[in-house]
Design a protein with these regions (language model features):
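Hydrophobic alpha-helical segments
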Residues: 1-118
């Protein structure tokens, strides 16, 4: 859910923000502060933070990450298979963000909370 939240925030998909905020809280049991952090590409958990930061960089840079970013996510314990899974998760969320934005999907989840200023 953290990656989905970061990508939805980056892409401005209101439907996906609402859906993943709800799922993050009620299924993944993330605290509101953790949901807010994920929307900014961060986490209070060091390993999740590395994955979420890397995922947001993949989205922002359209896959053009540098060696330092790869080294950082590897240093957090992610191997090539897990890095590929992060990239695929980003790609899937970009797809659903675009589809729901173009389709102007009606938000049928509670609205995402406003993020607190950092």
């Amino acid at each position: 859910e953290r990656i989905a939240l970061a990508v939805a925030q980056h892409n401005g998909c209101g439907y996906c923000l609402a859906a993943h905020s709800y799922l993050g809280k009620h299924v993944a049991k993330l605290a509101d502060a953790e949901i807010d952090a994920a929307r900014g590409g961060a986490s209070s958990d060091p390993r999740a933070d590395a994955a979420t930061r890397f995922a947001l960089s993949v989205a922002r840079n359209r896959g053009n990450v540098d060696g330092a970013e790869l080294a950082g996510v590897r240093a957090a314990g992610f191997g090539d298979d897990a890095i590929l899974e992060i990239v695929v998760n980003v790609a899937l969320n970009v797809l659903t963000n675009y589809v729901n934005t173009v389709a102007q999907t009606e938000v049928d989840f509670p609205a995402a909370r406003q993020r607190k200023a950092a």
